[in-house]
């Protein structure tokens, strides 16, 4: 693509309005427009750009995060057969800071920085591909993340209540949010509700809930721990019991929501025909998180561009003939974190000394032997995983475990 043959439109996206700035290949500002974020008003943008485009050149639109507030506009522009590029926020911010002697912050300045980033990185920026399937998958993944955050807060609140009502609660329930534990807190929010309960009574009640996993020994442990705590019945215990019951009810609700979301995620994963779960250590949840961030793999022409998008490609810094590779601070942080966490999981070794993934572990040890730190070796694994994931998504192939002797060459 010859840059002189295009004009560039950078669009700063917001919930209610968008601001667009048009520049030419020499970074001369040609025009600006602010328009509502409604499909009925999108033609105003094209009309304004046509007035600025006196030489009838091709137009390239750069959208900062084309999968959020700008998704309807990206879909509309693509349907009109325009070139649409997805500009990472970190890239446009860097352009804004280096544009002049004084850093300015406004919608117009941001839009101009996005246009400049589109001009300077025309061949490196990924095409915007707001596919409905991947967008819906991303919505489900974000919903699941929000549910898990809320659930974690509720579990912490439940810990706060239980440490007063049952000081030794960790002796009989290691996981206080599993179904059996939630049933117990729901029916026995404080020790006064256990008065008169025998071991057999408690076992008869908990066995069906735990699917026959709650033994007589566990029930004895519960009653013995409660008796040994010698907790006095404090004033206003009923009010605190109500708080416990409310937290348990919320946890049960979120667990139900989580099960529904996970079921839908599994259905969508199968519908997309993905093969990422054939990689050892990758389950459906990890796979859909990766898919939601990458989107349509066709928008990346090679694995290097995907690595750059994820912020995993090393950045080379050098001066006077000396240099080193460092981790970049740009890219999709969510995708980067998912891949890095996956790399950590794949190099783990069991208590018996058996590696979870012998090939990845051998590659990790090879990099460590070359003098790299653990973090640098994990980044190397992350970069290899990006290439593996790219090839699998591009070709629809399953993961094939290579021979350990060749692990230093490929994963």
Predicted segments with their positions:
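A detector of single, family-specific signature residues
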Residues: 1-411
